């Protein structure tokens, strides 16, 4: 969190402790302290393809959805719902999911599971609600049916007479059961759906008519009872009245640290009523706007930005203790793993006070338990070549134990993820460290279609600087099998950089999710002299699209123009690594076992 600075009119002491050279640095150091915590983590082998988890307050059990090796080319033949003891992390039961015909016409005659991605518990009716992004379905099962053979739906939204893209609920993600109002809320592409938990009547709500929305996560405000949903496509947060099913407020989430990168990719949302704040995890682009946006709960204005991680995903908050837990998925499409950590953040100070190294990569979901501990699901696949019996042969649809998943002759080793539980104890307050970081003032420009460009406002001859921007698409391309209501992918444009009208660089923009952007380097000519001003222009060079451009003016100096910001951070401390509980094996699919006695040993 940025620290307060000394007034420019304050009288400065002759000397400053700790080697600080200015009144601002001395004042910042005096104000720097942080909440000290002791972090413990426990871990056990989990399931292949873990997605989300839900806690039952009635049975005190955790239910985990698992669907492995699901791709656009084929459905999954390794999937289950597991019941887990949240104290020991042992898997007590695994379900036999319903087997259906492959929904892809080119794989007619083959089979897949009706899978489970999103999940929540309805203790009032003794049911489990799950979403299936592979078949665009929401399905309800009985909790006590996990160990009674193949699961049979109590109800499903899936209509076999309709194609995938004609299903009523589009690409469902999270499910939240509001027992007080007897409704289940499901997020997905195009809005959210409200389903009566007794009659299963479905109502669609479009929070942003005229544009395609994609709410993903759902969190309940413990004070008002309203729901908060984060929109991944539109970078907005919706506050929803669960009684009237209406959006009572829409809050835009602005850029956190790179202002000309207006796209932040909203993911998780949590609130703290006592602090009057909303916390939004944002994935950003290549480290830009990657972290947690802190919004004023009353006005919706950005108060603070906490930088963290490579690709932050899910988060939960322990409001009683004002502790935020934030997972880092890491880079999704790189050979080298990244992410795999969970940050412990003091919400009062906006400071990361601890970090758990959960897995090699891919933290996907967090669940807060009543005792304040947090269960973490990763998708790293760190347990290699496991054998499971919740697997079917894609050609026959028959259950068969296997450590390999086969589709169209291609074999994929079945790797399992981990279940991790984090517990945090307060240990008082300690002096922190004042960290200084450079803030480089930027010159920014915008083209006629809203594409942006930004670079340092002051440059030095011979210096290499970064130029970046958002937008710059050369049209769109649409998949022929997708309905027109689905978003088209933008085509990255060919771009050129001009310095005072002369072309100095040509390159192609990049594609990420539904957007296009660019990051490139520019070497400042040695012929430029301090005191001069020069114009840098980025323009499209794609022959098939109308020309457009954006320009900025930069000033040349002998030295870079940098501002220094001070922030209080926790003292450097090593990551917490989980202790490992011996794996007791998977119970037979459709069956169960009693809790085994296990010992906990250090990893």
Model-identified regions with their sequence ranges:
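Predominantly soluble domains enriched in secretory-pathway, periplasmic, or organellar proteins
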Residues: 3-448, 462, 466, 496, ...
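Extracytoplasmic/secretory-pathway segments with low complexity and glycosylation-like composition
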Residues: 41-43, 344, 426-603
């Amino acid at each position: 969190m940025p620290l307060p600075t000394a007034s420019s009119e304050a009288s400065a002491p002759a000397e400053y402790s700790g080697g600080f050279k200015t009144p601002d640095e001395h004042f910042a150091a005096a104000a720097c302290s942080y909440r000290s915590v002791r972090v413990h983590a426990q871990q056990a082998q989990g399931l292949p393809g873990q997605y989300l988890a839900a806690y039952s307050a009635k049975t005190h059990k955790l239910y985990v959805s698992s669907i492995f090796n699901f791709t656009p080319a084929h459905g999954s033949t390794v999937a289950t719902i597991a019941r887990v003891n949240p104290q020991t992390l042992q898997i007590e039961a695994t379900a036999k999911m319903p087997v259906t015909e492959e929904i892809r016409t080119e794989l007619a005659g083959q089979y897949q599971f009706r899978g489970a991605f999103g999940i929540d518990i309805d203790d009032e009716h003794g049911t489990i609600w799950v979403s299936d992004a592979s078949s665009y379905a929401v399905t309800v099962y009985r909790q006590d049916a996990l160990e009674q053979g193949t699961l049979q739906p109590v109800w499903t939204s899936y209509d076999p007479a309709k194609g995938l893209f004609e299903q009523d609920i589009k690409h469902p993600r999270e499910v939240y059961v509001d027992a007080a109002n007897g409704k289940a809320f499901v997020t997905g592409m195009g809005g959210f759906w409200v389903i009566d938990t007794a009659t299963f009547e479905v109502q669609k709500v479009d929070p942003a008519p005229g544009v395609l929305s994609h709410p993903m996560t759902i969190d309940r405000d413990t004070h008002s009872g309203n729901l908060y949903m984060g929109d991944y496509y539109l970078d907005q947060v919706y506050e929803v009245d669960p009684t009237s099913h209406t959006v009572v407020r829409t809050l835009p989430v602005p850029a956190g640290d790179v202002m000309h990168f207006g796209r932040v990719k909203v993911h998780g949302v949590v609130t703290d009523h006592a602090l009057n704040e909303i916390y939004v995890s944002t994935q950003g682009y290549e480290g830009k706007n990657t972290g947690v946006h802190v919004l004023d709960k009353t006005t919706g204005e950005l108060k603070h930005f906490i930088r963290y991680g490579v690709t932050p995903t899910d988060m939960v908050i322990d409001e009683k203790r004002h502790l935020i837990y934030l997972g880092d998925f890491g880079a999704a499409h790189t050979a080298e793993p990244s992410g795999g950590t969970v940050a412990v953040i003091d919400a009062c100070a906006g400071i990361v006070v601890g970090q758990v190294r959960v897995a090699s990569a891919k933290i996907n979901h967090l669940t807060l338990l009543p005792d304040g501990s947090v269960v973490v699901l990763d998708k790293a696949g760190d347990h290699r070549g496991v054998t499971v019996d919740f697997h079917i042969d894609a050609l026959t649809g028959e259950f068969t134990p296997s450590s390999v998943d086969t589709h169209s002759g291609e074999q994929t080793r079945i790797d399992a993820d981990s279940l991790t539980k984090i517990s945090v104890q307060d240990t008082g307050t300690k002096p922190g460290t004042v960290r200084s970081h450079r803030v480089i003032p930027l010159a920014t420009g915008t083209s006629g279609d809203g594409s942006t460009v930004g670079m340092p406002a002051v440059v030095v001859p011979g210096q290499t600087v970064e130029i970046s921007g958002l937008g710059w698409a050369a049209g769109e391309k649409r998949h022929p099998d997708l309905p027109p209501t689905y978003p088209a992918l933008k085509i990255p444009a060919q771009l050129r950089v001009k310095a005072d009208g002369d072309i100095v660089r040509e390159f192609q923009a990049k594609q990420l999710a539904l957007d296009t952007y660019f990051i490139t380097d520019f070497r400042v000519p040695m012929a430029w002299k301090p005191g001069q001003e020069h114009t840098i222009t980025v323009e499209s060079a794609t022959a098939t699209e109308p020309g457009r451009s954006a320009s900025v003016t930069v000033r040349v100096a002998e030295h870079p123009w940098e501002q220094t910001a001070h922030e209080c951070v926790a003292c450097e401390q090593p990551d917490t690594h989980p202790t490992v509980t011996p794996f007791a094996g998977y119970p037979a699919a459709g069956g169960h076992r009693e809790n085994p006695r296990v010992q906990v040993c250090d990893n």
